[in-house]
């Protein structure tokens, strides 16, 4: 009877261990997904800053020419 109880308890321990491993896997997956999301936001922000800086510098360079045309 003790051997049967030992096997049943080991089965529950294994099931609980698998449950914890799956929870940890889900948390790791969500953390990676969040990291990619933040990296994408940062990339878009940097692209906007660079593009706006380039457009501002170009308009500053060509402003006398534009004022002659206008």
Curated annotation (Swiss-Prot):
UniProt entry keywords in alphabetical sequence: Glycoprotein, Host endoplasmic reticulum, Host Golgi apparatus, Host membrane, Ion channel, Ion transport, Lipoprotein, Membrane, Myristate, Secreted, Transmembrane, Transmembrane helix, Transport, Viral envelope protein, Viral ion channel, Virion
Annotated lipid attachment (N-myristoyl glycine): 2
Pfam families to which the protein is assigned, alphabetical: PRRSV_2b
PTM remark: Myristoylated.
GO cellular component: extracellular region; host cell endoplasmic reticulum membrane; host cell Golgi membrane; membrane; viral envelope; virion membrane
Keyword Membrane: yes
Virion surface compartment spans: 2-25
Role, per record: Minor envelope protein. May function as a viroporin in the virion envelope that facilitates uncoating of the virus in order to release the genomic RNA into the cytoplasm for subsequent replication.
Protein name listed in UniProt: Envelope small membrane protein
